């Protein structure tokens, strides 16, 4: 990464990634910065109300991203109404909870509960403007209808201090993670891929085609906007989270803080079993996170993913399973 020379300026950050690529963890690194207004998966609200491949979806998504980056929520009442009742999205962002939520502790089991008011357009706009930096995390499939070079050029030109980080992960690990949370298929399909060859292969072929297209787009964007668009491997982030976090903050022109360092340290060292669920942002066992797919996927499943996603493996330097060298 090349450090920004404008560390005192306000920054806008867009995190792009495939689902199950570790983007929630990356987002939480920014979310723990006291000067960051962080928004987790805002476009998911549009998928509830709008046909994904329609012109209306494209227009609404572009407008929503522009309004978020410019702290203008007065015209986004429907969006805020949906976000008010989406716990995962809301509680992934400090700025959407702290001004609105009160916690109470139940005496009999010492559990904490939150009571939150609905998000208010004016308060949300003011909260955003009071934070120096705006960070938004979006999964690439929510941008697929219009994620192209022309839109990227327009987005960057209209937001002079916007930079983009494109997070990529070993496709074998992504498939294993998708299986773990049950997003696509039953566990038996992956664990016994040889008995469900057509179903599993069809999905993997589609997945790898999308991932290859996404990587091709990212490589082109990084070459054209090399000071504003960067590709990051998830594995590099979790191997040396403090070092990579510092490099990222330098790239975006955001100062490192004690709060971020504390979060990175805690998330890397925790042994709390409550943080082992599929949506946890704790990263206590690095080797397990990188290589758990080796135990979860059958050899047939691994070979299917590798044959279809080979360009991704080669370009991002992931070693095929037949090698003894770990990725």
Regions found by a protein language model. Give the residues of each.
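PAPS-dependent sulfotransferase catalytic domain
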Residues: 93-261, 269-282
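C-terminal accessory extensions appended to soluble enzyme cores
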Residues: 289-327
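PAPS-dependent sulfotransferase catalytic core
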Residues: 1-118
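Short, well-ordered beta-strand elements within core beta-sheets of diverse protein domains
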Residues: 14-16, 232-237, 293-295
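Amphipathic alpha-helical recognition patches that constitute DNA-binding helices
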Residues: 14, 25, 163, 240, ...
């Amino acid at each position: 990464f090349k450090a920004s020379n404008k560390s005192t300026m306000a920054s806008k950050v867009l995190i792009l990634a495939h689902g199950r690529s570790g983007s929630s963890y990356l987002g939480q690194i920014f979310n723990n910065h006291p000067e960051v207004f962080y928004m987790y998966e805002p476009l998911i609200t549009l998928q509830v109300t709008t046909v994904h491949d329609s012109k209306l979806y494209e227009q609404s998504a572009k407008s929503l991203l522009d309004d978020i980056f410019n702290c203008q929520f007065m015209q986004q009442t429907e969006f805020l109404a949906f976000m008010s009742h989406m716990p995962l999205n809301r509680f992934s962002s400090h700025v959407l909870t702290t001004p609105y939520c009160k916690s109470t502790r139940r005496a009999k089991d010492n559990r904490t509960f939150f009571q939150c008011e609905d998000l208010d357009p004016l308060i949300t706009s003011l909260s955003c403007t009071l934070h120096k930096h705006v960070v938004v995390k979006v999964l690439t499939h929510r941008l697929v209808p219009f994620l192209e070079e022309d839109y990227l050029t327009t987005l960057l030109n209209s937001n002079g201090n916007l930079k983009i980080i494109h997070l990529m992960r070993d496709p074998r690990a992504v498939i294993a993670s998708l299986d773990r949370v049950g997003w696509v298929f039953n566990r038996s399909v992956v664990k016994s891929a040889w008995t469900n060859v057509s179903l599993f292969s069809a999905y993997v072929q589609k997945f790898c085609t999308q991932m290859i297209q996404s990587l091709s787009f990212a490589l082109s964007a990084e070459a054209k906007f090399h000071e504003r668009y960067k590709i990051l491997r998830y594995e590099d982030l979790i191997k040396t989270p403090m070092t990579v976090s510092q490099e990222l903050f330098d790239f975006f022109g955001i100062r490192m803080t004690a709060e971020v360092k504390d979060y990175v340290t805690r998330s890397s060292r925790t042994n709390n079993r409550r943080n082992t669920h599929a949506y946890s942002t704790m990263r206590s066992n690095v080797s397990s996170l990188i290589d758990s797919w080796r135990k979860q996927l059958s050899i047939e499943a691994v070979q299917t993913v590798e044959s279809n996603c080979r360009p991704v493996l080669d370009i991002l330097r992931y070693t095929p399973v037949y090698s003894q060298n770990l990725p």
